[in-house]
């Protein structure tokens, strides 16, 4: 599954496994690396963190870490909020979010409220190049109107687009896989 039409039918994991031979491979939805990096960066160990990633020209998406574990679902689809029934096509979602229009803000707020209602995370982190400080204030106001204060998570705008978190998430996952291999080797 890809936002890049040319990769939609590509079987990247199979191709990588062929090239890597017996080496372990971990491939996941990019937002899952971002949220994992943000989780580790925050020093969390048992908390729930959800990242809402809004980047121009791609579907908005979320990813969550609960108690140190990435929530990926049955086959990595967890967090793909662009597939929810928002009453508009995926192309329309991409357009309204990229434009920063009132409809785009409404879609971002609905996504945030859905995450809050389903997961009730400790923190909801916004990253990407769409949500700025002004939009973040509007999101916070809308969420505060809809959710009682005792159920509202900390809502925070990332200091950067989230790219640093992505690299940190990949690094942390690689370290864990290396440790798992060492344990497996010595057993």
Question: Which stretches of residues belong to each language-model region?
Answer:
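Phosphate-binding/catalytic loop of phosphoryl-transfer enzymes
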Residues: 1-88, 184-185
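ATP-binding/phosphotransfer module of carbohydrate and carboxylate kinases, centering on a glycine-rich
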Residues: 13, 17-23, 41-43, 88-187
């Amino acid at each position: 599954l890809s936002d890049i039409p040319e990769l939609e039918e590509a079987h990247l994991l199979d191709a990588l496994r062929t090239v890597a031979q017996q080496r372990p491979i971990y491939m996941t939805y990019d937002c899952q690396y971002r949220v994992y990096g943000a989780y580790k960066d925050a020093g969390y160990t048992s908390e729930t963190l959800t990242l809402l990633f809004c980047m121009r020209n791609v579907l908005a998406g979320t990813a969550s870490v609960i108690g140190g574990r990435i929530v990926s679902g049955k086959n990595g689809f967890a967090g793909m909020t662009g597939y929810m029934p928002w009453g508009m096509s995926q192309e329309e979602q991409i357009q309204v979010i990229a434009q920063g229009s009132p409809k785009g803000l409404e879609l971002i707020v609905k996504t945030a409220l859905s995450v809050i209602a389903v997961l009730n995370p400790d923190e909801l982190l916004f990253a990407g190049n769409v949500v700025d400080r002004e939009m973040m204030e509007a999101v916070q106001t809308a969420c505060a109107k809809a959710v009682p204060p005792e159920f509202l998570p900390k809502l925070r705008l990332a200091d950067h687009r989230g790219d640093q978190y992505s690299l940190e998430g990949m690094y942390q996952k690689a370290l864990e896989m290396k440790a798992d291999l060492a344990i497996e080797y010595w057993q």
